[in-house]
């Protein structure tokens, strides 16, 4: 058959591994159709895509209206009827022809030339089908048809089947669509408390036709593992040992007789060759060919996370040859040399002697160095993955590094991240704590389910293992810390059964699969855990979890903390004391500008039905489109947080009042996170030796009230600015016990060497005048803070200070210090500013700061000054037309100080008109009635 040019969407792309003579057709692009026999409707289709997106583009459903609705799937026929994609193709004859699908969401039957090819039932797996014989016998134009089933309907059918596993009532968590735990699909597609329940279907990743002649091979997947000689996943690697490179390639095609493998490793920046030659100990197992080599331990330049050194990367090319030295397959991957280790080992005698409390460690070590993990949790950035572009993720990751974050927890259950997202993380130095896609549920453990999961685990572990940004594999989200206690309360007598099922899936199945495919990554069975008692890889349950076998006064594992009782939001005695904080937070509203993207003007008020229905905290718990009762609880929590601590907005204009309320919820959220992050970072020098803070959550999936610090279009909330500030390397922090009046000031550093400097403590009233005798507080305190440590520099009680009026007082803390960033040769200066008020913001005797703002085209900076009083929470806001962030925001500004602030534009144009519409406000504006 002759290949028609118009039918070949794109010949071999640079990212496709191939050999000369191989024919690969990338099926991405237009030319597909989306059909429904039930509706008798056909519209143009695309690949990759999902059904909703093609229907949006075809005008069948309205994207704006549909995105407002809570349950699009209930109101449109999407997901209830089979969706079929067709692609006409006319291909030349080759010895073998394969269909390769990198991702089908989720339940499909596939035909080619009207012949059944196969079926799929896992969104997270790569599938390939041999259609050689079908093509040879095909008498018509070959056509690919992919029939997609409704995931909610199929999940319900599985749940109703006689052999379906059941759990005690009240244990399984339904957000909107039920029964998500029976299927291997993105769990949040069925609804979550921060996003919609669209349950999309479609070919969400690329697909290919692969044709080979003779002994040609197509590379399906590649597992490159870089580790120190002798390294074992759960033990600290010996940094003095040479590097072992293990290259394993999964192929399509006949495995050659006595294959050989060669490798070339080049510096990605300079092109210089680090190593080249034949791999040793080449073995064949199934369709995988594997070989190893050794590299001198000091030869490669190490890869470091952001803030700890350079992100040195290498291009690694692996070639497979037959016994005649003919090249059969070649693949190139970009990688880096690093060790990353999650230390869960028992506290040693040396650590006890240093004042660290007994128990077990729970922290990360990069290239042998313990470090403080600063970051957040990333959720799916869109309800439809085909809309997630490289440019969009680059913008998001720019915000991550600009926010002084070095780690993201890739939450389950979204989806395993695309390779290009790991590539971006490699470049920017962002560690990605990755998880298998199980969350807040108990899962089946029948043979078919476990077999499906095993293939999913092996494929994804091998696929992303070469990325130096990969930091951890965790079994799932909150399974040990939430689900096991829930089932214990629901069925105490059957608890041991469910613990056994948990161990069967996450320890007996997944752990060995991870260890068999990587030596370089640690595995934890659950995101939040008390750690393990011991590891015995030859045992049926190779890791003995600690569970509740803890000792009072000892600390184990990481913490997960949410408390919606706003009366204790700033009482740090309620915060958990542990080794690492992997989740904590509180929700807030997005900005007015973001609401205007999705909501009609008449709905822009706090308790409008549309605003309330887009708030999924708390979720409906089922298929209801009138979730006002549960939503009102979450809306009420935000309201109570504002009313307890901040001036209550009361604008005469309804839209302005709505905007002020949105901003007020962000102030509460940001201050609450700041309070916790300061507390956790201070823990680095406390007995708990706390070495990680990952707040919930980084970004939004749509325009709605959520825990996010970055809104759907990339606009930063107050939270992300405040987190950026408090994640600086050296910070000064006040800790106030508002019950006893005790005030402590600490300096905290995450540098790897001691740092020195001074902190100026200055009391002023809210007009900006200094308070006499500095209220009895020393004006300057010198400090020395140890590596990864904290030190108390000042302690007092508010009752002992000579403050004329607590409501008219603010303490300005200004740090100036010197230290050395990791892997740098010279010291640098560090500055940080914080503040403290002896009453909550709502009780302050605020003065109008009379803010003024100007812009210099020459310096491209805004200048802000207060001419009337102290400006608290000084907030620069920008209009639509560009996306980016200010160099600093939500800061305290004293009268007479001119502060220059630049704007980093990530998208759009900063025009003269745009600049004129940039505004500035403060806490004063929140209480003023226009």
From Swiss-Prot:
Pfam families noted in UniProt: Glyco_hydro_2, Glyco_hydro_2_N2, Ig_mannosidase, Mannosidase_ig
Coarse class of the protein's main subcellular location: secreted
GO CC annotation: extracellular region
Reactions the enzyme catalyzes: Hydrolysis of terminal, non-reducing beta-D-mannose residues in beta-D-mannosides
Alphabetically ordered keywords of this record: Carbohydrate metabolism, Glycoprotein, Glycosidase, Hydrolase, Polysaccharide degradation, Secreted, Signal
Pathway: Glycan metabolism; N-glycan degradation
Signal peptide positions (record): 1-21
Superkingdom to which the source organism belongs: Eukaryota
Glycosylation sites: 62, 246, 281, 315, 346, 536, 607, 630, 657, 737, 760, 782, 789, 797, 823, 909
Protein role: Exoglycosidase that cleaves the single beta-linked mannose residue from the non-reducing end of beta-mannosidic oligosaccharides of various complexity and length. Involved in the degradation of polymeric mannan and galactomannan.
Entry's family note: Belongs to the glycosyl hydrolase 2 family. Beta-mannosidase A subfamily.
Name of the molecule in the record: Beta-mannosidase A
Gene: mndA
